[in-house]
C-alpha cells in the first residue's frame, strides 16, 4: 500500500447542494422492489443457473412477494432466451408480476430482446449504456452528443419494433450506467434525452434507474446525486425513479436507504446481496431494516431459513453465518453481559407490547426462527472449542447449524455436571445424542457417568433391502425398539432417504443432507458419516440426525432414523 494514496486515487467531488432536504426526511413506506437475481446475480456466479434452477428461483421470488423480476439478458444467452419464452408461453408469470429483460444499445440485440418477450401481458425492457468520462473517452471514444444520439436512435428503433405488438404493455427503463462516476449535468442531459425520445407520459410509463455501477463514494454523496437528479428530471410526475446500488465499499444498504430519502421510489437488488464483485444491495436486509422500523416491506420472510436454502441451492453460494437476519449466528450471544440482558428482556417482554429485547433488533420468530440457541456459552466457560475438538480428534465436521444445536446440548450437560468436558466426553455425548438418539429432558443429576441420562432411544436400525419401484425405490426396513422387539416397515420414494421417511409414516421434512468421510478405516472398512437436518410440522425448529456406516446408503438411512428418534423422544417426553 502507498504511504500517500492521494498520489494514485482521487476522492469523488461532493455535490453542490446546500439546500439538500433528504437528511431531514423519514422513511415511511417501502419502495417498489425489483429482484435482479436471475440476471445480475446469475451472471456473477461461478456456474450460471440452468433453466431448472432459474425457474425454481423465479417461483420462490414470486412466492415471497416480488412484483418486478428481471428474468434475464435474452439477447446475450440462449438459456436466458429460452427461459423467458418458457415463462411467457407457459403462462407462468402471475398477472400482478412484471418481468424485466435487459439489453445494450445495439439494433440486433434490441430486436432479439423484443422477440424474446413478444406476447407478454406487460414487460419492462431495460436499456443501458455507460456515460462516465473514463468509459466515454477510453472504452468507446464517444463525445456526449454522440452518446445522446446513440440513446435517441435506439429508443426510436424500440418504439418501431414494439408498435406492432399492441397486445403488450411496454415499459421502458433507462439506466445511465456508471452514473455515480459521471458528471451530473451529463447524466441529466442523457436521461432527459431518453425521456423525450420515449415520450414519457400518463400512458407511456418509464423508469429512470440510477446505479452505483461501482460504489465509489459515501452514501450521503449518492443521496445528494439522487436528490439533484430528482429535482431536475423532465416529466418527473410520469417517471419512476429507481436505484441499483452495488456493494464495493460495503455500504449498498445505506446507499439505498439514503437514496430513498432523496427521492428514489424503486430499488433493484438481489437476495442476500448476490451480484457482481462485492454484490448488489441485499434486498432482504433492506426490507427487514424497514420492518424493524414498523414499515411493512411488502416481502414475506416469515420462513427465512427456507428462502436461504433455495438461494444457496440455486446459486451454489453459501450465506455467511454473520449475515444480517439470516446467518446461523446472528441471534446468538456469547458474551455474558449480552446473555444476561437478553434473558431479562425476554422476562420483561409482554406479547402485546412493542419489541424491546436488548441486542435483538427483531423477534426471531417473525422470521420462522426459534429462541433455542440465542443464549450460549463460549470459550469464556471453556466450551468454545467443541467443534474444533470433534473435528481434530474424531474427524467430525458439523454443519454450522448443527454446531449451534450440539453446543446447546453440551452446555446443558456441562452446567449440570459442573465439570470440564474432555474431548472424549464430547464424543460420548455426540455418539449418544446422534448415533443413539435420546429422549428429551434427560436426567443429568448423576455426575459420575453420562449413561443414565443417555440410554433411551427409538428406531434402532437392524437391516434394510431396497428394490426398484415406480416412485423410485422401495425400502423394506427392519427396526428394533428399546425393548428389543423387531418390526418391519415399508415405504417408497425417489431415493433411499425419501423411502425411509415414507416407511416411518411421519410427516418428516428433510431440509439438508451432507455426507462425509470419517477419515478412519481403509477400503471396505472405511467409515462414512451421513448428516440430515429434519423438521416436523408440529414441532418448532429442526433436529439433526447422524448415521455412521461403511456403506453410505446405510449411513443415510440411519441418519434419518436418528433424526426421527430425536423427535419421537421429545414428543414422548412431552407426553
From Swiss-Prot:
Its EC number is 2.3.3.13. The gene is leuA. It comes from Herbaspirillum seropedicae (strain SmR1). This is 2-isopropylmalate synthase. It catalyses: 3-methyl-2-oxobutanoate + acetyl-CoA + H2O = (2S)-2-isopropylmalate + CoA + H(+). HAMAP family: LeuA_type2. GO terms for cellular component: cytoplasm. Residues 31-305 form the Pyruvate carboxyltransferase domain. One of its GO terms (molecular function) is acetyl-CoA C-acetyltransferase activity. NCBIfam families: PRK03739.1. Residues 437-575 are annotated as: Regulatory domain. Belongs to the alpha-IPM synthase/homocitrate synthase family. LeuA type 2 subfamily. Its cofactor is Mg(2+). The lineage of its organism: Bacteria, Pseudomonadati, Pseudomonadota, Betaproteobacteria, Burkholderiales. Homodimer.
Amino acid at each position: 500500500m502507498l504511504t500517500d494514496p492521494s498520489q494514485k486515487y482521487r476522492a469523488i467531488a461532493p455535490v453542490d447542494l446546500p439546500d439538500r432536504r433528504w437528511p431531514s426526511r423519514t422513511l415511511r413506506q417501502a419502495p417498489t422492489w425489483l429482484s435482479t437475481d436471475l440476471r445480475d446475480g446469475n451472471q456473477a456466479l461461478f456456474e450460471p443457473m440452468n433453466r431448472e434452477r432459474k425457474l425454481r428461483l423465479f417461483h420462490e421470488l414470486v412466492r415471497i412477494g416480488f412484483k418486478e423480476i428481471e428474468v434475464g439478458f435474452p439477447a446475450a444467452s440462449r438459456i436466458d432466451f429460452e427461459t423467458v419464452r418458457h415463462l411467457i408461453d407457459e403462462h407462468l408469470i402471475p398477472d400482478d408480476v412484471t418481468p424485466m429483460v435487459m439489453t445494450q444499445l445495439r439494433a440486433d440485440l434490441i430486436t432479439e430482446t423484443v422477440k424474446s418477450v413478444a406476447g407478454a401481458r406487460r414487460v419492462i425492457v431495460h436499456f443501458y449504456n455507460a456515460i462516465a468520462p473514463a468509459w466515454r473517452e477510453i472504452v468507446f471514444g464517444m463525445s456526449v452528443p454522440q452518446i445522446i444520439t446513440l440513446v435517441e436512435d435506439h429508443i426510436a428503433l424500440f418504439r418501431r419494433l414494439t408498435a406492432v405488438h399492441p397486445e403488450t404493455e411496454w415499459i421502458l427503463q433507462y439506466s445511465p450506467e456508471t452514473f455515480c462516476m459521471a458528471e451530473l449535468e451529463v447524466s441529466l442531459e442523457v436521461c432527459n434525452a431518453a425521456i423525450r425520445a420515449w415520450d414519457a407520459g400518463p400512458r407511456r410509463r418509464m423508469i429512470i434507474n440510477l446505479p452505483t455501477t461501482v460504489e465509489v463514494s459515501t452514501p450521503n454523496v449518492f443521496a445528494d446525486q439522487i436528490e439533484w437528479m430528482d429535482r431536475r428530471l423532465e416529466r418527473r410526475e410520469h417517471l419512476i425513479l429507481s436505484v441499483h446500488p452495488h456493494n464495493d465499499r460495503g455500504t449498498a444498504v445505506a446507499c439505498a436507504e439514503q437514496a430513498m430519502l432523496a427521492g428514489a421510489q424503486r430499488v433493484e437488488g438481489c437476495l442476500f446481496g448476490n451480484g457482481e464483485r462485492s454484490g448488489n444491495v441485499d434486498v432482504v436486509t433492506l426490507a427487514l431494516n424497514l420492518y424493524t422500523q414498523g414499515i411493512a416491506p411488502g416481502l414475506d420472510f416469515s420462513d427465512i431459513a427456507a428462502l436461504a436454502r433455495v438461494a444457496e441451492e440455486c446459486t451454489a453460494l453459501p450465506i455467511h453465518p454473520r449475515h444480517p437476519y439470516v446467518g446461523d449466528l446472528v441471534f446468538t450471544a456469547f458474551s455474558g453481559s449480552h446473555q444476561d440482558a437478553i434473558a431479562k428482556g425476554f422476562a420483561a417482554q409482554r406479547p402485546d407490547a412493542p419489541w424491546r429485547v436488548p441486542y435483538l433488533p427483531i423477534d426471531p420468530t417473525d422470521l420462522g426462527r426459534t429462541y433455542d440457541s440465542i443464549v450460549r456459552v463460549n470459550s469464556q466457560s471453556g466450551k468454545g472449542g467443541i467443534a474444533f475438538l470433534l473435528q481434530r480428534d474424531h474427524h467430525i465436521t458439523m454443519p454450522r447449524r448443527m454446531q449451534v444445536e450440539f453446543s446447546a446440548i453440551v452446555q446443558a450437560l456441562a452446567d449440570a455436571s459442573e465439570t470440564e468436558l474432555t474431548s472424549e466426553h464430547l464424543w460420548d455425548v455426540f455418539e449418544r445424542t446422534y448415533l443413539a438418539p435420546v429422549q428429551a429432558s434427560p436426567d443429568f443429576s448423576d455426575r459420575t457417568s453420562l449413561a443414565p441420562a443417555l440410554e433411551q432411544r427409538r428406531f434402532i436400525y437392524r437391516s434394510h433391502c431396497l428394490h426398484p419401484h415406480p416412485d423410485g425405490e422401495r425400502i423394506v426396513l427392519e427396526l428394533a425398539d428399546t425393548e428389543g422387539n423387531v418390526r418391519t416397515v415399508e415405504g417408497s420414494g425417489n431415493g433411499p432417504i425419501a423411502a425411509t421417511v415414507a416407511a416411518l409414516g411421519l410427516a418428516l421434512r428433510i431440509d439438508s443432507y451432507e455426507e462425509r468421510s470419517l477419515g478412519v478405516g481403509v477400503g471396505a472398512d472405511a467409515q462414512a458419516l451421513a448428516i440430515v437436518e429434519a423438521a416436523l410440522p408440529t414441532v418448532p425448529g429442526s433436529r439433526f440426525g447422524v448415521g455412521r456406516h461403511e456403506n453410505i446408503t446405510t449411513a443415510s438411512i440411519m441418519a434419518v432414523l436418528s433424526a426421527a428418534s430425536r423427535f419421537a423422544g421429545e414428543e414422548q417426553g412431552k407426553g
